[in-house]
């Protein structure tokens, strides 16, 4: 809200369906590609600061590429390169999957729904096939993921028109009403972005202390653990010292050590942990955001979805009707992803009006 020309809080929408007001002495706008939309709620006029850039990855069966290490390949006729990364080792020197990415293209479509289109798939596969001896086709693509980078828009005199050439530096701004906005940056500089944004908020508050992120360990990073079993290696690698919580779940119910999705390394206890410790509130949260199941093997994940839904339903208080709704939403998301891969970027944007 705005009171005495100062923003004093936000109206929040939380799952499943509720809105509530939150008061605060300082509001930080760290909303990525939506940052300009949020600024518009605070300021009557402001320049657009965001230039969205889309990046996509594809997943294919490892046998189609057979790389035993992560490699970087050039993109023909483009000043870019792609990573080709093997994933899920089988223990005999081979892997289950290889994922390839990422792209970097201007994006003019709906920021709420960036999808991997036929153009994206063709771009990645053309680059891959120029560097491998096998022929990888669209039929081999079993998973995709896409997202938008909130790049800082360059000044009008910038020479290059490519998003790949834009700076990945971040920018922190404060509005006349005291809203701190942080834009730009990238995943690997998230701590520095947070530090600069919090330090700016501290100035507004008149506080002398600065952000402490430099001295804070990551979640689960309280000491190295020597692992012995395959299960230990997986859970310790994913959760660090927090793996003890998941091992306790398995001790109380050994069935939670079973695989969550066929062919993927995730266990049923991870779905439970996602709900109880990682704020997962939907089936899609568990299968797409807390684990990467849907991203790596959409078909297998869709097949496993009913059982996963049944597993987490008691933890979230879902009745049969809500379970059906969650499952229908997830299946629809998978279908929309399938459909997007069959159309060009232009056709996809046109379909959104």
Regions found by a protein language model. Name each.
Residues 1-13:
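Single conserved hydrophobic/aromatic residue that forms the stacking wall/gate
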Residues 8-10, 22, 281:
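Structured loop/turn residues at beta-strand edges in well-structured enzyme cores
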Residues 11, 54-56, 80, 168, ...:
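Residues that flank catalytic or metal-binding motifs in active/ligand-binding sites
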Residues 17-26:
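Core beta-strand elements of the Rossmann-like FAD/NAD(P) dinucleotide-binding domain
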Residues 31-33, 44-46, 60-66, 74-77, ...:
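C-terminal accessory subdomains/tails of enzymes that are appended
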Residues 37-58:
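Glycine-rich beta-alpha-beta "Rossmann" dinucleotide-binding loop(s) and their flanking helix/strand
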């Amino acid at each position: 809200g705005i009171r005495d020309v100062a923003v004093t809080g936000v109206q929040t929408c939380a799952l499943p369906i509720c809105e509530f007001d939150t008061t605060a002495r300082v509001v930080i706008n760290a909303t990525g590609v939506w940052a300009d939309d949020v600024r518009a709620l605070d300021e009557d006029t402001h320049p657009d600061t965001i230039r969205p850039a889309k990046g996509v990855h594809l997943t294919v069966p490892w046998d189609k590429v057979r790389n035993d290490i992560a490699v970087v390949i050039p993109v023909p006729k483009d000043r870019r390169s792609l990573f080709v990364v093997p994933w899920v080792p089988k223990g005999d020197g081979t892997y289950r999957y290889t994922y390839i990415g990422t792209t970097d293209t201007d994006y003019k479509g709906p920021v709420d729904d960036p999808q991997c289109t036929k153009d994206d798939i063709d771009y990645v596969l053309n680059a891959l096939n120029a560097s491998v001896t096998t022929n990888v086709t669209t039929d081999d693509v079993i998973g995709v993921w896409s997202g938008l980078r909130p790049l800082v828009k360059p000044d009008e005199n910038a020479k290059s028109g490519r998003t790949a050439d834009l700076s990945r530096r971040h920018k922190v701004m404060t509005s006349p009403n005291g809203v701190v906005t942080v834009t730009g940056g990238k995943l690997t500089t998230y701590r520095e972005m947070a530090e600069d944004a919090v330090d700016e908020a501290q100035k507004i508050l008149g506080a002398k202390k600065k952000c402490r992120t430099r001295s804070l360990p990551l979640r689960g990073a309280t000491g190295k653990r020597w692992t012995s079993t395959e299960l230990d290696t997986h859970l310790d690698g994913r959760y660090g010292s927090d793996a003890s919580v998941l091992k306790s779940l398995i001790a109380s119910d050994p069935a939670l050590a079973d695989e969550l999705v066929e062919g993927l390394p995730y266990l049923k206890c991870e779905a439970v942990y996602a709900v109880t410790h990682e704020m997962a509130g939907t089936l899609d949260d568990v299968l797409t955001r807390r684990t990467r199941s849907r991203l790596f093997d959409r078909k297998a994940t869709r097949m496993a979805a009913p059982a996963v839904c049944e597993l987490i339903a008691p933890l979230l208080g879902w009745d049969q009707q809500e379970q059906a709704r969650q499952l229908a939403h997830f299946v629809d998301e998978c279908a929309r992803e399938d459909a997007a891969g069959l159309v060009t970027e232009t056709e996809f944007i046109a379909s959104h009006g």
